[in-house]
């Protein structure tokens, strides 16, 4: 969009420019005369001589003027310097850390005076003419007549706004190796060669510093922390607490069974032994069937005799009754397995008389006293009680027991173990039950 320019503004700007050009031309001529007067000093003495520091610290020593600029007069043409002279001037300026161009006064130049001093053939004059035209047009548009503002417009280009450094996102572990390999492939000296000429290398340097300082540190930290968090997460996922057991409710005996069958599909109950199952069944039977809640019964105390060989036999509770058929069959099986043991021992003894052998054959259905004592002593009854039982059942003093005597003696031992006392005589009903 073009801004319209009035005639008054245009004439005012032209008058200001002419006034500035006249003043700038006079200043340049004075400077040239001063430089030509100082150029009579030899170059070597001017460049390598050490001047004493001035007493006033605000006044600094003026640097030497090269002969090319000292011989400059109004209307002369600038000769292009060769490559060797430029290198020499650059080295001379770097050794003293002073740039020769920086000592010229910052005064605005007009197009007319510039063409009088610098020829139109030189490249520097053409460039300055283009910049002056640009600043003049800019001053006309905005109505600015400040020569210092015009000088700053062509002296240095406007700096670009700096980029805000944003923290790059943390790359994953897989991209860490690729980022490090790219950083290793970059050549740091190559990034600083052309910083004055182009801005691309400056951006590369900024990105490299960002990656090396913030992104690389964050990536390395994340790569070390990710496996530990993954391992912790996996461990926490595997270990889950067991579900709490359902609360036990007291009610009818059928209700817990139904509840147990319904919950079995959800949670597998622990395996119960036969004793625990029997105990639970007894507890359910003991529970009241009515809705009224009664105080729980105390647990039953089971007492055991610490000395099993000592039996408490009540004297008043005398054995009475008869031998049951099931008990009789059990006792007869024991007799059948142990009868006639003494006969075999007598027959194989060569020192025994033949009469004794014939008599032993008649005792084939008898059980020897040694065998009887061995069998009855396994009941852990006292020897005195066993002797009383032997006297009650043994009719013939031959040291052996018949079938009926052995069965009745076994029955009396069981009665003593049950807590009954021994009678003075065995009842006739008992003898009849074993015949």
From Swiss-Prot:
GO terms for cellular component: cytoplasm; plasma membrane. Keywords: Lipid metabolism. PROSITE patterns: EH. Residues 11-20 have a biased composition (Basic and acidic residues). Belongs to the IRS4 family. Positive regulator of phosphatidylinositol 4,5-bisphosphate turnover and negatively regulates signaling through the cell integrity pathway. Involved in rDNA silencing. Residues 174-186, 249-265 have a biased composition (Low complexity). Residues 48-59 have a biased composition (Polar residues). Residues 1-20, 39-71, 136-204, 233-277 are annotated as: Disordered. Residues 327-435 form the EH domain. InterPro entries: EF-hand-dom_pair, EH_dom. This is Increased rDNA silencing protein 4.
